[in-house]
Amino acid sequence: MGILDGKRILVTGVLTDSSIAFHVARLAQQEGADVVLTGFGRLSLVERIARRLPGPPPVLELDVTDEGHLGSLAERVSAHTDRLDGVVHGIAFAPQSALGGNFLNTQWADVATAVQVSAYSLKALAMAALPLMDGGGAIVGLDFDASVAWPAYDWMGVAKAGLESCARYLARDLGPRGIRVNLVAAGPVRTMAAKSIPGFADFEELWPKRAPLGWDITDPQPPARACVALLSDWFPATTGEIVHADGGAHAVGG
């Protein structure tokens, strides 16, 4: 028996098979869960990637900035399962002008995009899934340490700080419904999304040196396993928490 036996999990944010969300979906299936994926934009690509999972799951289109997509999500998911026990938020995006050392000159429209897609979408996704979570469950989001100002991360760092605050407020308001809300702050992993961040090479060099446990930037397993653990029943009284799966780098000075 796996720790997710019988659970139904919605996983967002799969872009390629290097995505942390992909490995969350794979591990969730291996631990007994039924999985539904969402994709944005190039849906056929996500469908091809989904076929690499142990059991190819259904893939639904979801643009978290589209009220129509959000409003119909529960109905579309219910075509495949009558409930959700867990939701994984693996969605983040910032325009290039909001990254790479341009912090002081970034225009509000680009800041707003980063915050809406990377932070507000946690609340939007939670509310969209809520009709299928009458029995309680777990919402887990993927995070990156927002306690300091990282080189080149700029407005994405601000958005991640917003994500962390959003998770705490959701934990407060969804707790009475039996829904736990937690984040996993991953160390840098060489994904397609990460490669688009200017200065990511600096993280690749810095992190293994800082992390007391070491850090492999090619291995998405540590954060994926943390997500699966939080989706399980093994943390029944944990909510509003940020679990760092980063080799311990967050705990030590530079």
Put a short name on every predicted segment.
Residues 13-20, 93-127, 135-176, 188-191, ...:
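Catalytic loop of short-chain dehydrogenase/reductase
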Residues 54, 60-71, 75-79, 86-112, ...:
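Conserved mid-core segment of classical short-chain dehydrogenase/reductases
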Residues 31, 135-136, 176-179, 233-234:
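Short coil/turn segments at alpha/beta junctions that flank glycine-rich nucleotide-binding fingerprints
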